[in-house]
């Protein structure tokens, strides 16, 4: 048994009705596989399609992540809260973009409240973090413990001078915006200094996923320091801030 589901991203293909496309695709599958039957409620297989700009992505759903656990890990639900904390779903997205393997060491040099480390730890990675503020180190330890994650270490250190010699990948969100502390440095200078050191820490063909204001143009900074820019995604926060989520690969 099977079902076909189609979703639109934003307002792309406004004249296309998702339900009609689901029906047409279902008919094609029924014509190809004679023993197949439609089951809208408890199907054995779910075919899933996404309509986006100039593309239709279609395939068989292999797994599903329920939204409730992400809600339960929202920053305000954690023991230690700070307004600059990254939401759990975005943190998991960034960890996934860095493509760590199980038991890899994932490092966040600007760990804040440990959003990235929590998500990496929950998928079986070893984690280590650092922050220039003692309050954040203690808060991160509290949050990690709350989710049953034991870090390899938490270091009070300035990420402009990385306190580690190696990591399998880095996932991080440097300070910027209204609630963050930059200790008098511009965000661009912080990113430049961090990336100049990070190129000596991760192996070739491994990744850094980091966020920054769109205006910083982090992809071009990464290329200056020996990284290949793989992809960028933009997240609107408010009128004066759009985040660029950038994936860089060491070459």
Could you describe each region identified by the protein language model?
Residues 1, 30-42:
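Short secondary-structure capping/junction motifs at helix and strand boundaries
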Residues 1-3, 105:
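Residues that mark the start of a beta-strand
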Residues 5-7:
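Active-site nucleophile-His-acid catalytic modules used for acyl/amide transfer and hydrolysis
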Residues 9-16, 20-23, 35, 42-251:
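Class I S-adenosyl-L-methionine-dependent methyltransferase catalytic core
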